Amino acid sequence: MKTLLLTLVVVTVVCLDFGHTMICYNQQSSQPPTTTTCSEGQCYKKTWSDHRGTIIERGCACPNVKPGVKISCCSSDKCNG
């Protein structure tokens, strides 16, 4: 009985995840929307222009960017859409 109870507790903890992850978009501007699971507070949307036009990149973490690149970091599910 104790083993069953322990197993249920472990499964509950793994399934609930206690909000430490979030869902972020991770596609380039010309691609269909896709998502990935990221660490809390770690979605970004990076925008810049080149000979192809305006490029948008989305993903996890908040990278350092070069001058001329706009970065937007956020901390809720699918906030970088």
From Swiss-Prot:
Stored Pfam families: Toxin_cobra-type (PF21947)
Entry GO MF terms: acetylcholine receptor inhibitor activity; toxin activity
Highest taxon, organism lineage: Eukaryota
Record family assignment: Belongs to the three-finger toxin family. Short-chain subfamily. Type I alpha-neurotoxin sub-subfamily.
Record protein name field: Three-finger toxin MALT0051C
Key words, A-Z: Acetylcholine receptor inhibiting toxin, Disulfide bond, Neurotoxin, Postsynaptic neurotoxin, Secreted, Signal, Toxin
Listed SUPFAM superfamilies: Snake toxin-like
Signal peptide residues on this chain, from the entry's feature table: 1-21
Function: Binds to muscle nicotinic acetylcholine receptor (nAChR) and inhibit acetylcholine from binding to the receptor, thereby impairing neuromuscular transmission.
Subcellular location, record wording: Secreted
PROSITE patterns, alphabetized: SNAKE_TOXIN (PS00272)
UniProt feature coiled coil, ranges: none
Tissue spec: Expressed by the venom gland.
Keyword Nucleotidyltransferase part of the UniProt annotation: no
Primary location group: secreted
InterPro entries named in the record: Snake_3FTx, Snake_toxin-like_sf, Snake_toxin_con_site, Toxin_cobra-type
GO cellular component, one term: extracellular region
Disulfide-linked positions: 24-43, 38-60, 62-73, 74-79
Presence of keyword Calcium: no
Organism expressing this protein natively: Micrurus altirostris
